[in-house]
C-alpha cells in the first residue's frame, strides 16, 4: 500500500514511513520480504531486517524484482537510483541480494540515455563491488556471451556450472528451486544480450534460462522498453496489459494505470531535485557517471 499522501520524494526518503507501510500492509509476502516484515513487526528494523544474520533469504531475488521503479524514476541518474536502493533494498535484502536490485535499478536508469545494450549492462555493473559474487557472475555472462555470441545455451551451461548453487533460501538449498538474485540476474542479462533488441527473443531466452522465469523476462523486457519506448513495443504484447490496467491490485487502491501516474510524478520530483528541467512534454535530465556502492558484509561462503 502507498501511504495516504500524494506520491512524493519525501515518502521514499522517509524510511520510517516506508518501513511502517511495508510491515503493516494487508497483502501477503514471501521469502526475504516476509522475513523482513516479521523482523520489523518484532522490532528488528532496517537495515538489520534484511541482514543475513536475521534474514535467511537475504540473497533472494525479492528486491531485484522490486527495483524496476527506482531506475524508472531516475532517468540517467544512476547514483541517485543507488541511493534510493540503499534506503529501500536493505529492508529485505543484503549483500548479493541487495546488489541485484542496485544493478537492475542502474540498468533502468541508464536505459533512458543509452541505446546500446552492452553499454547499459557494463556501465550499470560499475555500481557493484568487484569483490562480490554478483559482480563475478555478471562478468562471466559477458565473457561467455562474447565467446559464444550465437548460442545462448552454451553461455547458460557455463553459468549453470559456475554459479547455479543455492546457499541461503531455506526452501531452495536442497532442491532445484533457486531464487538467488545472482543467478536470476544472470538470466536477465543473457536475455538482454542475446535478445539483441528483439522483445520476443529477449523474453524467450530469459524465460527458457529457468528458475524465476516470470520475473526475469519481465525485468529484461522492462529495460528494453525503456530503451526503445512504448511505441516500439510490438502490438502483440499490448492487449493483455490494456485489459487489466484499471484493475486494483489485491488489498490496495492502486491499479496499473495509477502506477503510471505515480511513477511519472516521482520521476518529475527526482528530476527537479537533481538539476533537471521539464518544459512542456520534454524532460531534461542530469546524466551521472556510475559510482561503485560500498561493499556489504558478506558471508564466508560467498568467498567460494
Positions of the model-derived regions?
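Acidic catalytic motifs of isoprenoid enzymes
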Residues: 1-61
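Structural helix-adjacent loops and short alpha-helical linkers that scaffold large soluble proteins
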Residues: 2-10, 77-78, 113-119, 195-201, ...
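Short, mixed-charge aromatic SLiMs
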Residues: 13-28, 88-99, 124-137, 208-218, ...
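Stable alpha-helical elements in mature extracytoplasmic
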Residues: 14, 64, 81, 100, ...
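Accessory "access/gating" subregions that flank catalytic or transport cores
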Residues: 36-58, 67-78, 86-91, 106-210
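Short sequence/structural elements of tandem HEAT/ARM alpha-solenoid repeats
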Residues: 79-83, 119, 235-239
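Catalytic phosphate/nucleotide-handling subdomain of diverse soluble enzymes
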Residues: 92-96, 103-105, 109, 187-270
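Acidic, carboxylate-rich catalytic segments that either coordinate divalent cations
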Residues: 135-177, 227-304
